């Protein structure tokens, strides 16, 4: 079976065609400074690139004729990888942090939960406030809603309600997200 491995196929999909791999008869050629040299046959363009000691790289195959550029492929590949790393570094994954409590919570414990939620929101994460019921406590959903609304009010300067208090099985949950500045 002559099937290529997944890794090889993926590598070939990502890497642009260079030098002899370019099979088009006519191509639009761009030099190292970015100016257009005109339309050449693939073999002429390859000769020009090799005489300059550089590579012929297919930039866009969707245009008619396809666009190729004379560049040092090693430097080009390094620059592309560096751009991808920078883009990955700048993106921030938002996670949901959970703060659990009971509807009968003491003042000090409540303040600890508020401080936890405050730190999570400052870090750019969403907060899932979870009021847990046990046994017959499920009858006191109004008290849990009041507690969650109080929490939302106490954190209103840094957060906004993404999901209002709602019953979720034996729990009452509310999701807060950081305010967009």
UniProtKB/Swiss-Prot annotation:
SUPFAM superfamilies linked: Translation initiation factor IF3, C-terminal domain, Translation initiation factor IF3, N-terminal domain
Gene3D superfamilies named among the record's database cross-references: Translation initiation factor 3 (IF-3), C-terminal domain, Translation initiation factor 3 (IF-3), N-terminal domain
Alphabetic keyword roster: Chloroplast, Initiation factor, Plastid, Protein biosynthesis
Record-level Gene Ontology MF annotations: ribosome binding; translation initiation factor activity
Gene Ontology CC terms: chloroplast; cytosol; membrane
Subunit structure: Monomer.
HAMAP family cross-referenced by the UniProt entry: IF_3
Protein name: Translation initiation factor IF-3, chloroplastic
Native source species: Gracilaria tenuistipitata var. liui
Gene coding for it: infC
């Amino acid at each position: 079976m002559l099937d290529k491995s997944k890794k090889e196929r993926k590598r070939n999909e990502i890497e642009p065609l260079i030098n002899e791999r370019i099979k088009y008869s006519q191509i639009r050629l761009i030099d190292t400074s970015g100016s257009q040299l005109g339309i050449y046959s693939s073999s002429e363009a390859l000769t020009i690139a090799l005489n300059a000691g550089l590579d012929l790289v297919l930039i866009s195959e969707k245009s008619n004729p396809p666009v190729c550029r004379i560049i040092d492929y090693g430097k080009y590949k390094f620059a592309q990888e560096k751009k991808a790393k920078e883009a990955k570094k700048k993106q921030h994954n938002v996670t949901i942090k959970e703060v659990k409590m009971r509807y009968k919570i003491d003042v000090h414990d409540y303040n600890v939960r508020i401080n936890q939620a405050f730190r999570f929101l400052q870090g750019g994460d969403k907060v899932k406030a979870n009021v847990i019921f046990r046994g017959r406590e499920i009858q006191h959903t109004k008290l849990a809603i009041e507690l969650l609304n109080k929490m939302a009010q106490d954190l209103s300067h840094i957060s906004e309600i993404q999901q209002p208090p709602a019953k979720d099985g034996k729990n009452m949950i509310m999701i807060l997200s950081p305010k967009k500045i």
